[in-house]
Amino acid sequence: MGPTASGKTDLAIALRQTLPVEVISVDSALIYKGMDIGTAKPSKAELELAPHRLIDILDPSESYSAMNFREDALREMAEITASGRIPLLVGGTMLYYKALLEGLSPLPSADPEIRAEIEAKAEQIGWSGLHRELLAIDPIAGKRINPNDSQRINRALEVFYITGKTMTELTAQQGDSLPYNVLQFAIAPQDRAVLHQRIEQRFYKMMELGFQQEVEKLRARSDLHKDLPSIRCVGYRQMWEYLDGDISLDEAIYKGICATRQLAKRQITWLRGWNSEITWLDSLDPTSSKLKMIEKIAQNSIKL
């Protein structure tokens, strides 16, 4: 696990050459076909060294949930373990990890009518007013959700209106836990400035590789639009705004870099608040040092 641009892929390839592992991608962007440059998808050469499961499995017009991921990942893990090898899950989509490790809480599906009612109420009293209502109903969720985060406020209230139970109550009712012994490692540079520099350098490299042309090709499709989960991926939505004429290219690049840094910050926040025990690895340490640490811990838990 780890934030974007932390070196997860390189370490996974090194592990693939050292241990009897098979890689499963845990990334909500890498699942999409035709979105290679902006997602920093492993190259053909990298995939030959370490094939990744659960990448390029969907068209950008399709949606995918944490529940879908859990089902697919469990299937792949069963197949890998049956062959006598070890599943190595690699990626930065923390919600997918959470769903896999803890199961899924029984939250209801969205109800368009109730959402419309909530939005109508927001027009009358504002989202700050609805946030105060949420604080009264579900103090824990209310304190966790930013007063300006209308999407999450809407969802938390919607869940309560549908079920009569708060989001906090329902998320405590998790599904089946993962039926495997799990070792968890997180990789990130200790110095946040290093990660920020890597993100900026990688974004400019993606531009050199043809990221704009990749988005132009997607935008030319009549079935794709900016509100799809695929196009909302960081970098893609900013480049889409540029192609729509809403911002300049320089602004798109700047906003894309900023959005990627914000994503990395959220990923690190998730990891620091993780309930399970995690072994942290410094991205700047030699690969050999990281491999030795992983092998040492693994040998005490798994028969290699």
From Swiss-Prot:
**Site location (Interaction with substrate tRNA):** 93, 115
Molecular function GO labels:
ATP binding; tRNA dimethylallyltransferase activity
Q: Which cofactors does this protein require?
A: Mg(2+)
Q: Kind of enzyme, top EC level?
A: transferase
The residues listed in the UniProt record as binding ATP, with positions renumbered to this chain, are: 2-9
Which SUPFAM superfamilies does UniProt cross-reference here? Answer: P-loop containing nucleoside triphosphate hydrolases
The organism's place on the tree of life at top rank: Bacteria
Its BP terms in the Gene Ontology are: tRNA modification
Q: Looking at the record, which segments are called Interaction with substrate tRNA?
A: 27-30, 151-155, 232-237, 265-272
- For this protein, the Enzyme Commission number is 2.5.1.75
Q: Report the InterPro entries cross-referenced here.
A: Dimethylallyltransferase, IPT, P-loop_NTPase
Substrates-to-products reaction catalysed: adenosine(37) in tRNA + dimethylallyl diphosphate = N(6)-dimethylallyladenosine(37) in tRNA + diphosphate
Residues where substrate binds: 4-9
NCBIfam families reported for this sequence: miaA
Q: How does it assemble?
A: Monomer.
Q: Which HAMAP family match?
A: IPP_trans
Which family does the UniProt entry place this protein in? Belongs to the IPP transferase family.
Please report the name of this protein according to its UniProt entry. tRNA dimethylallyltransferase
State the organism of origin: Actinobacillus pleuropneumoniae serotype 7 (strain AP76)
